[in-house]
Amino acid sequence: WTLVGGGVFDRAQTERSTASVMPKGSKWQKSAVAAFEPERNALVLEDGERLHYRTLVVAPGIKLNWKAVDGLLDTLGRNGVTSNYKFDLAPYTWELVQNLRGGRALFTQPPMPIKCAGA
């Protein structure tokens, strides 16, 4: 939520359900994939079900590992520690930016090729 953390949008303007942005006629399969079989135009779900496709779009997403940084969970969302990767914290980022009058602000991002170059 870079644009929320940067004060461009209010958080409420950026929230939508996933179902509301699914293209009409598409099927949303809410299951984990265990294996791909491109030679058969198929994939196998974790429960063993095999799905065949003509066109496949895979959106694996990302899993954030907040516990990987010692002490982060203890202070995230207060003490000047925030993240634009967390929907409820992006407004706090903007609050911190607005109130910064001196000192240093540290911004980090994961290595490319992408999560979100600006977040």
PLM segments and residue spans:
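Generic, low-specificity signal for short hydrophobic/alpha-helical stretches with a mild N-terminal bias
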Residues: 15-18, 25, 58, 75, ...
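Glycine-rich, N-terminal phosphate-binding loop of Rossmann-like dinucleotide-binding domains
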Residues: 47, 60-61, 109
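Generic detector of intrinsically disordered, low-complexity, polar/charged segments
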Residues: 2-4, 45, 58, 68, ...
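Rossmann-like dinucleotide/flavin-binding elements
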Residues: 64-119
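N-terminal Rossmann-like dinucleotide/flavin-binding domain of flavoprotein oxidoreductases
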Residues: 1-53, 119
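Short hydrophobic core segments
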Residues: 51-63
